Amino acid sequence: MSLVLLSLAALCRSAVPREPTVQCGSETGPSPEWMLQHDLIPGDLRDLRVEPVTTSVATGDYSILMNVSWVLRADASIRLLKATKICVTGKSNFQSYSCVRCNYTEAFQTQTRPSGGKWTFSYIGFPVELNTVYFIGAHNIPNANMNEDGPSMSVNFTSPGCLDHIMKYKKKCVKAGSLWDPNITACKKNEETVEVNFTTTPLGNRYMALIQHSTIIGFSQVFEPHQKKQTRASVVIPVTGDSEGATVQLTPYFPTCGSDCIRHKGTVVLCPQTGVPFPLDNNKSKPGGWLPLLLLSLLVATWVLVAGIYLMWRHERIKKTSFSTTTLLPPIKVLVVYPSEICFHHTICYFTEFLQNHCRSEVILEKWQKKKIAEMGPVQWLATQKKAADKVVFLLSNDVNSVCDGTCGKSEGSPSENSQDLFPLAFNLFCSDLRSQIHLHKYVVVYFREIDTKDDYNALSVCPKYHLMKDATAFCAELLHVKQQVSAGKRSQACHDGCCSL
């Protein structure tokens, strides 16, 4: 009896058709079916999706892969379907291209699954790199004949950076500090100093702590011995302004990422006050023992009050007599425009740091506002920033590009990365607008080496120029007094009969 039941079960299983699965393998060249003539071909895919997945955090740099899933269209042409080919093109610092062919193990007998739902398959295998744009295309096989447009489907996928919850486990991200938590604490000790504490990492021994409150008000380099375990580091940073509520930015310098490592931030709060216990007085337990203490306390309080009133009166008197010299002007907004051949890392960054630290300037750079430029357009962005800025500085330099390329390579900020040069556009825009003497005080030329003004920009020869660091004091003095000059109605007469657009 049992033998009969087993035979019936086997017969039933053989009667039910097996569902197709996929077997995928690399196929770099054209598919063999492309060389054949086909009267009928399967239709295109219904849907194509891509997402990154992690197979194992500890397997290495290629543990993060691309999960490509697709849905077949439910029509009669599915009976002709043999395989689906998927090709992925990646564009970043270098371009990659690879294809896989996924063969279906069984011929399709139905347009949908017997259990219900559309036919859905997936393939996991393409490695995912950081910050890369991928173009994924897929088509069914047999494909269209030669010189015919075949059905296909494509999607775009941009992989995130090291801050992503999946990508942070890549080796490159781990070496850049993606898993490091410095646990930053910062407190205001007094009006002149801020204490910053953080947890170090064995990845490096050099850090920079920077404090910002709309502008940079203090920074300090931190060097710690290279240790195999995390330790707690502390540094006291002098500040030049109100630091309560300011932002602390901790920049590590690791061998693998240099100055482009993952940065961490914290907030400055008031340091907790350490309470001193007041000793108990035995006289309080004696009748009348508190009276001398009360009289003494009243006498001390009266003396402190009188001294405080005198000091406040004296302070107000001194403040009134020296108000013009002690009042700090708000930061000067400076728009910096520079040609694309100037090295951003070695020239623009250093010049920006000089403006912020020595000239109390709030710097506007197109490099920092690429998103706004894309939204507004370069002309509208330049016009808006020119209106908001107190000074427009055109930075010139005859630095040799090869020097910058040799030290910067293809890193961010190198001349080769500048996709759009706003220098000629800014020159033409401001030149056509600034033919009136009223606006000439707003424009200035700064250079680091002796320069020859190009014929295209010969209007610069009549504009005020400053040679850094030779004229650093005079340059800062002009920036720091720009608001006083404007309020008093003083206009710079350094430019005559020319367009002072730089």
Swiss-Prot record:
GO molecular function terms attached to this record: cytokine receptor activity; interleukin-17 receptor activity
Keyword Chloroplast listed: no
InterPro entries for this protein: IL-17_rcpt-like, IL17R_fnIII_D1, IL17RA/B_FnIII-like_1_sf, IL17RA/B_FnIII-like_2_sf, SEFIR_dom
Pfam families per the UniProt record, alphabetical: IL17R_fnIII_D1 (PF16556), IL17R_fnIII_D2 (PF16578), SEFIR (PF08357)
Transmembrane segments: 293-313
Any single GO CC term annotated in Swiss-Prot or TrEMBL for this entry: plasma membrane
Tissue expression notes: Expressed in several endocrine tissues, mostly in fetal and adult liver, kidney, pancreas, testis, colon, brain and small intestine; not detected in peripheral blood leukocytes, lymphoid organs, and most cell lines.
Keywords: Cell membrane, Glycoprotein, Membrane, Receptor, Secreted, Signal, Transmembrane, Transmembrane helix
Subunit and partners: Interacts with DAZAP2. Interacts with TRAF3IP2.
Function: Receptor for the pro-inflammatory cytokines IL17B and IL17E. May play a role in controlling the growth and/or differentiation of hematopoietic cells.
The name this protein goes by in its record: Interleukin-17 receptor B
